[in-house]
């Protein structure tokens, strides 16, 4: 029996509609619209696409969106000075610096310079630490978006064996913390993992984020598993595929997220949720 498709596009639209309704309500109450600053350094084509989509969604939900497109020659100290300025700006609730940054700029130093209550990407060590201590504030967008998908599909995660393939700071590590919080027994696999197939065949819930097309054979999927594919890979043919062999996996899983249209749309939707949360929970009282 074919798996149910986890429709990230529809759920992301629901989230955006909820945020837009709340923004309309805020304005009716005489409050300001949330503000998001999006900083792009250099001219990486993929980064430009991501940034454009983020700005577009900001406009859709009624946020104030401020763009800072800096030349590739921007120095680290110039970028840090801009972040300091945005940290102090009361009209800005969220600061997003598009990664990766050009050579010569330290990603970690830049992330740590953003005020934790404006870190809407959820990458600051303070926010990761809060998640680790089971008291999350602003949460990494892709992992939190996946949890939202599971919640909206009423999937009970308590007691499931969850396996995360990939241990990046952006997805894999925070995803493992989110799944622990959701009651899973969680395993994180990475490039040093031995017998990856064994782990995947025992996964009730599988999240794959490695950026390699078709990396996980569909036949490895445990029958009835819940499968979330974070990979977005463009083949030479132009086709966009995930990290999992979709067709075979779909025949074995109970739920599966497609690529495109699965996890991807949730990342930007969660960014918008985080910005609204930062505005309402941390910054409203300062007005």
Curated annotation (Swiss-Prot):
Coiled-coil region(s): none
Residues that coordinate or bind NADP(+): 166-168, 232
Keywords, in A-Z order: Amino-acid biosynthesis, Histidine biosynthesis, Hydrolase, Methionine biosynthesis, Multifunctional enzyme, NADP, One-carbon metabolism, Oxidoreductase, Purine biosynthesis
Catalysed reactions, semicolon-separated: (6R)-5,10-methylene-5,6,7,8-tetrahydrofolate + NADP(+) = (6R)-5,10-methenyltetrahydrofolate + NADPH; (6R)-5,10-methenyltetrahydrofolate + H2O = (6R)-10-formyltetrahydrofolate + H(+)
Keyword match Membrane: no
Entry keyword annotation includes Hydrolase: yes
Cross-referenced InterPro entries: Aminoacid_DH-like_N_sf (IPR046346), NAD(P)-bd_dom_sf (IPR036291), THF_DH/CycHdrlase (IPR000672), THF_DH/CycHdrlase_cat_dom (IPR020630), THF_DH/CycHdrlase_CS (IPR020867), THF_DH/CycHdrlase_NAD-bd_dom (IPR020631)
GO MF entries: methenyltetrahydrofolate cyclohydrolase activity; methylenetetrahydrofolate dehydrogenase (NADP+) activity
BP GO annotations: L-histidine biosynthetic process; methionine biosynthetic process; purine nucleotide biosynthetic process; tetrahydrofolate interconversion
EC number: 1.5.1.5, 3.5.4.9
Protein's pathway: One-carbon metabolism; tetrahydrofolate interconversion
Matches recorded under Pfam families: THF_DHG_CYH (PF00763), THF_DHG_CYH_C (PF02882)
Cellular component, GO annotation: cytosol
The protein's assembly and partners: Homodimer.
Annotated function: Catalyzes the oxidation of 5,10-methylenetetrahydrofolate to 5,10-methenyltetrahydrofolate and then the hydrolysis of 5,10-methenyltetrahydrofolate to 10-formyltetrahydrofolate.
HAMAP family: THF_DHG_CYH (MF_01576)
Similarity comment text for this entry: Belongs to the tetrahydrofolate dehydrogenase/cyclohydrolase family.
Protein name from the UniProt record: Bifunctional protein FolD
Organism this protein belongs to: Pectobacterium atrosepticum (strain SCRI 1043 / ATCC BAA-672) (Erwinia carotovora subsp. atroseptica)
